[in-house]
C-alpha cells in the first residue's frame, strides 16, 4: 500500500448560516410553550427546564412573533401538516445559506455554475422532490449536478455530509461540492406530559447552513485561501446504548427519546475514541486549538469538557451558540465553526501547537445510536 500523501486536499472554501425571521427570547418562548402544554404540566417545571437549557434566544419557523403560529392550544397537527411546514421553512433556510455561501466563494472564482455535486442534509423532515431539487432551480445550478441526501442521521449529519464532500473532491479534484443543511425542529413541538419530550421542546430550534468544498493542490494553490482544510472524519457507535437516544416518525410528528444518562455515557466513553482518532493524525487532545462541541444541552457540553479535560474557554463557542440559537440539530456545528472562523483567537487553547505548525480544529457531535462523529480540520490562519 502506498504511503504517499495525496496531491490534493479538501478545502472548506466558504461557510454561511441562516435562521428564520422570528426571534424568540426565552420569556416569549416560555409563554407560548405554557399555552401549548397540557394543563397538568406545572408551569414551574417548564420554567426550570427553560432556565437549565442555557438558551436565551432561538429562531423558530413554526411561531409567528407574539403568536402561536403553526400551533393552536389543544390542537395537535399530524405528521403530514408538519412536513408541509418543514418543506416551506427548510427550502427558505437552505437557499438563504447557500446564496450567502456562494457569494463568499466568489473570492475563489466559484459561482453557481461551478457546482458539480450537491449534498443536502436534514433530520426534521422529508419531501420528494426535496431541498436538492429546489436549490438547483433557485440557485441556477446545472441540471446535471450529482445529488446526495443525508437523511435522518440526527445532530451529527453535518459531519456525515462533509465526509461525503471530502471523499468526492479527493476522488475528483475538479469537483466543487455545495453542502446544504436545514433543520426545522419547531415542526415537532409536542403537546405532551412526557419529560423527555418536554426537554426536547425546550432545547431545539431552527436554522440552516451551507458550505462549499473544493480540491486544493498544495503545489499550485490555484484557489484563494480556504477557511480550513478538512483533514478527516471519524465515527463511533457506543455499544449497548441504542435505547438512550432515538428519533422516531410518529402519527403526530417526529418523536424524540432522550435518556437522562446520555451525558454520563459520553463522559465515560468518548475520551478513548477521541484520543485514538487524533493519534492517527499525530495529534493529542492538547494539540487542538479550536473545539466545536455540538451542544445537545448544557450537560452534554459539560460531559465532553470533563471527559477531555477542556478549559471553559475551549467550549465557550459551543455554549454561546446554544445560548443565542438553541440546539439546531445538524446545523449547529457549522454555526460553531463560523464563530471560530470569525473570532478564532477568543476560543484557542493556549497549549495548542505553535504558530509554525497547523491550527487543528475538531468538531464533535452525537446522535441516536449512541453515535459519535468527529471532523478534524486545519484552520486557515488569520
Task: Please provide the spans of the model-predicted regions.
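A contiguous, well-structured pocket-lining segment that forms one wall/lid of small-molecule binding clefts
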Residues: 85, 96, 101, 246-322
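Claisen-condensing/thiolase-fold acyl-transfer catalytic domains that form or cleave C-C bonds
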Residues: 6, 123-125, 130, 142-144, ...
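Active-site-adjacent elements of ketosynthase-type condensing enzymes
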Residues: 127-133, 179-199, 232-250, 297-306, ...
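Active-site glycine-rich loop that binds ribose-phosphate moieties when present
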Residues: 143-144, 150, 160-164, 181-206
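Phosphate/pyrophosphate-binding loops at sites that engage ATP/ADP/AMP, CoA/4′-phosphopantetheine
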Residues: 97-115, 220-222, 272-289, 340-353
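Condensing-enzyme catalytic core mediating Claisen C-C bond formation in acyl metabolism
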Residues: 2-87, 176, 191-268, 272-276, ...
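Short, well-ordered amphipathic alpha-helical segments that serve as non-catalytic structural scaffolds
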Residues: 55, 89-106, 164, 208, ...
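Conserved beta-ketoacyl condensing-enzyme motif
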Residues: 53-141, 152, 285-301
Amino acid at each position: 500500500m502506498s504511503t504517499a500523501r495525496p496531491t490534493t486536499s479538501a478545502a472548506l472554501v466558504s461557510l454561511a448560516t441562516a435562521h428564520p425571521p422570528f426571534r424568540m427570547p426565552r420569556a416569549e418562548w416560555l409563554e407560548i410553550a405554557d399555552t401549548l402544554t397540557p394543563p397538568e404540566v406545572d408551569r414551574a417545571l417548564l420554567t426550570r427546564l427553560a432556565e437549565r437549557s442555557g438558551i436565551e434566544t432561538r429562531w423558530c419557523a413554526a411561531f409567528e412573533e407574539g403568536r402561536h403560529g403553526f400551533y393552536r392550544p389543544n390542537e395537535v397537527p399530524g405528521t403530514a401538516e408538519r412536513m408541509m411546514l418543514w418543506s416551506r421553512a427548510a427550502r427558505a433556510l437552505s437557499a438563504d445559506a447557500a446564496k450567502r455561501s456562494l457569494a463568499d466563494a466568489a473570492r475563489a472564482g466559484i459561482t453557481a455554475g461551478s457546482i458539480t455535486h450537491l449534498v443536502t442534509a436534514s433530520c426534521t423532515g422529508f419531501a420528494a422532490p426535496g431541498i436538492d431539487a429546489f436549490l438547483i432551480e433557485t440557485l441556477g445550478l446545472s441540471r446535471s449536478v450529482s445529488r446526495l441526501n443525508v437523511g435522518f442521521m440526527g445532530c451529527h449529519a453535518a459531519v456525515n455530509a462533509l465526509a461525503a464532500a471530502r471523499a468526492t473532491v479527493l476522488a475528483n479534484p475538479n469537483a466543487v461540492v455545495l453542502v446544504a443543511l436545514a433543520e426545522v425542529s419547531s415542526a415537532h413541538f409536542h403537546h405532551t406530559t412526557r419529560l423527555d419530550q418536554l426537554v426536547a421542546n425546550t432545547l431545539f430550534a431552527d436554522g440552516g447552513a451551507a458550505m462549499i468544498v473544493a480540491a486544493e493542490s498544495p503545489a499550485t494553490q490555484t484557489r484563494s485561501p480556504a477557511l480550513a482544510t478538512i483533514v478527516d472524519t471519524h465515527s463511533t457507535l457506543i455499544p449497548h446504548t441504542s435505547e438512550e437516544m432515538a428519533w422516531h416518525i410518529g402519527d403526530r410528528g417526529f418523536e424524540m427519546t432522550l435518556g437522562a444518562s446520555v451525558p454520563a455515557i459520553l463522559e465515560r466513553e468518548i475520551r478513548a475514541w477521541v484520543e485514538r482518532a487524533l493519534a492517527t493524525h499525530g495529534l493529542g487532545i492538547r494539540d487542538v486549538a479550536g473545539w466545536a462541541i455540538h451542544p445537545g444541552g448544557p450537560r452534554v457540553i459539560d460531559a465532553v469538557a470533563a471527559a477531555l479535560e477542556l478549559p471553559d474557554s475551549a467550549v465557550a463557542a459551543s455554549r454561546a451558540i446554544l445560548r443565542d440559537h438553541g440546539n439546531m440539530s445538524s446545523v449547529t456545528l457549522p454555526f460553531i465553526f463560523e464563530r471560530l472562523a470569525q473570532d478564532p483567537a477568543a476560543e484557542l487553547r493556549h497549549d495548542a501547537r505553535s504558530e509554525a505548525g497547523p491550527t487543528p480544529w475538531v468538531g464533535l457531535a452525537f446522535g441516536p445510536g449512541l453515535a459519535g462523529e468527529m471532523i478534524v480540520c486545519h484552520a486557515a490562519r488569520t
